[in-house]
C-alpha cells in the first residue's frame, strides 16, 4: 500500500511541474547585476570631428607662443560647425565698464562674455598669451548681425563661416564712446590704451596658423574687423595697426 502511495505522490508532483508557468524564475543567486557606471571626466574625442575641420591639437602651433585652454561651456556658447571657416574676424575686449580698476583681468573679461552670451574662439592677452575659448570645430558667437559685400550667404550669418579672435585692449574715445562718456574715458590710464607689441606678434602667428590650416587667404578680404561686418561695432578700432597684424 505504501508503495502505491509513493508512486501516486510522484505522479502528482510531475503533473504540477508540467502545468506550471512556461518561464521558470531564475534563482536570485544566479541574477547578474550590472555595476553602476563609474563617472569619468568628459573627454572630447577629436577623431569624431568633421575631417574638413582640422583639430587644433593635431596641428603644431608656433612653439614660442603660449597656448592655453580657457574654455567656455561648449553647449551654452557654441554649436557644431557645419561649414569650413572662410574668414577670421578681429575684435577687442576688456572689462573697463564694470571693472575700471582692473580692466584686463581675464576672469572679469570672461564673465563679461558669459553675461552677454557671446564667445570668441581665441583671446590674446597683453603679454601675448593666447587662450582658446571655443574649439575651431565649433561655431562661436562673436559676429552677431551684419553683412559682408552684399552677399546673402553671410548676412547675419558670419558666425558660421568665421573664426573670432579677441584682443584684450581699450580703443580710442571714438571707439569707446558707445560704452562711456568722455569724462570717464579721460580717467583711463593712457598706458592701457591700444595694443602691445606682444599682442601683434601673437596675433600675426595665430593668423598665419589659422589661414594655413583652413586654407583662408592671408589678406584683408578674409581677415576683417568686427566694425567692417557690423556698423554698430567699433572694434578693433582706430588704434589697431592692420599692417602689423598682417605682416609677412
Model feature map: region roles:
Residues 2-9:
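Sec-dependent signal peptide recognition
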Residues 15-18:
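C-terminal motif of bacterial Sec signal peptides marking the signal peptidase cleavage site
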Residues 20-22:
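Bacterial signal peptide processing site
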Residues 27-49:
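Post-signal peptide N-terminal segment of mature Sec-exported envelope proteins
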Residues 51-81, 87-89, 94-213:
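Active-site-adjacent loop/helix surface patches within enzyme catalytic domains
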Residues 214-232:
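Acidic/histidine-rich, metal-coordinating catalytic segments
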Residues 230-248:
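Short, low-complexity, polybasic intrinsically disordered segments
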